[in-house]
């Protein structure tokens, strides 16, 4: 619900920090576009620094999220992460086409992240969004040879990939560092 309130600009990025602190959470996961006109993606360097300062004052970790894996999206998310003092960037690929071609494009995106940002101090997490199965995600992580790359497990996304979530969890478990929790019903 916070995401939807952020889309309506009723909860803004700084508010999310307050909510996390008030609920004794360890940090926030925030998309570069959360808050619309007031999003991190629309903040200048001074505002991003102030957001990071507030998170540190509240002893909160920041995880930046973006909804693509292309260079421009990664560059934007990493720039925001570094300016706010975030610890990680979550991304997910959004490509269509032949699976072999899509996996190749994603592998190239990950290679770009490795070559450009492996020494940035950030960790990177790839999330499956409906298309890739667990073994394909694990292969992408292993083949990347990138120690700072891990997987985000989302129960419902595995259903959308036509894979039983518990089986997917078992396959992905050694590489999972983040989880999205939500209800889902297999019909």
Placement of each model-derived feature along the sequence:
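Active-site beta-loop-alpha junctions enriched in small/polar residues
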Residues: 1-5, 31-35, 65-69, 94-96, ...
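Short, hinge-like loop/turn segments at secondary-structure boundaries
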Residues: 46-48, 81-83, 107-108, 142-145, ...
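Active-site-adjacent beta->alpha loops and helix N-cap segments on the catalytic face
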Residues: 39-49, 72-73, 97-109, 133-135
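N-terminal pre-domain/capping segments
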Residues: 1-84
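CE4/NodB-like, metal-dependent polysaccharide N-deacetylase domain
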Residues: 79-86, 111-119
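Active-site gating/metal-coordination segments in enzymes
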Residues: 75-101, 105
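Acidic/histidine-rich catalytic cores of soluble enzymes
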Residues: 28, 112-187
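Conserved beta-strand positions in the central sheet of alpha/beta enzyme cores
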Residues: 28-29, 63-64, 88-90, 177-180
């Amino acid at each position: 619900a916070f995401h939807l309130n952020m889309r309506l600009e009723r909860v803004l990025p700084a508010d999310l920090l307050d909510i996390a602190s008030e609920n004794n959470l360890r940090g926030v996961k925030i998309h570069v576009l959360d808050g619309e006109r007031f999003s991190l993606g629309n903040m200048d360097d001074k505002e991003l620094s102030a957001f990071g300062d507030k998170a540190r004052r509240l002893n909160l970790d920041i995880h930046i999220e973006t909804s693509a894996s292309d260079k421009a999206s990664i560059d934007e998310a990493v720039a925001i992460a570094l300016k706010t003092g975030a610890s990680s960037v979550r991304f997910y690929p959004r490509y269509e086409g032949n699976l072999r071609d899509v996996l190749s494009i994603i592998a190239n995106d990950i290679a770009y992240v490795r070559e450009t940002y492996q020494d940035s101090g950030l960790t990177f997490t790839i999330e499956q969004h409906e298309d890739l199965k667990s073994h394909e995600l694990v292969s992408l992580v292993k083949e990347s040879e990138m120690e700072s790359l891990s997987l985000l497990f989302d129960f419902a996304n595995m259903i959308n990939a036509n894979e039983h979530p518990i089986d997917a969890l078992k396959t992905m478990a050694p590489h999972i560092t983040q989880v999205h929790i939500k209800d889902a019903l297999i019909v």
